[in-house]
Amino acid sequence: MLNKEDLNQILDINVAWIENCDSTASIMLGMLGVTISIVFAFDYAKVIISTIKEKCLNTSFWNIVFLILLLLTVCSILYGGYKLIKSLVPQIDMKKLGNDEMLCNNSIIFFSSIATHNNYTKFLNSLKKTSDEDYLNDISSQIFLCAKICDLKFRNYKSGLYFSIGGLLGFAILMTLGYFA
């Protein structure tokens, strides 16, 4: 088995990947917010509303298709934003992340487990009772749990990115076509 230093280094790498995902998701949410603000801050909102009104009043097959596609792009943008936000929500329920008898349930590393101690003295006693083998298992458990958290975050980030950018591009294309058609 790897030693403490090796395991701590692996844990640090996993934590860095989680921080990376949080940073990029925050940046993407900011860009999404700025883009939506620009659309509604200038005269684009008037053009969008007049285009939608025109398509609603002049019902034809293509106008109905246009409105349905427009609704889908708005839903895509909203869903993408939801998934980006979801990638930022902390996942701290160890039982949901991994349910294995080998996982350390009373971690001295994981903040949520540490907080279950009623006071500092009880936590300190728990630290003193921890053997080297228990500590290595605790670090290994945290590596596994952090990897699961990281994987879940990046899945949410990736789908949020695709849906929000795809929705924005689709919306821009549809509005351009709707305005000139």
Residue ranges and their predicted role:
Residues 1-27, 34, 42-181:
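Cytosol-facing regions at membranes
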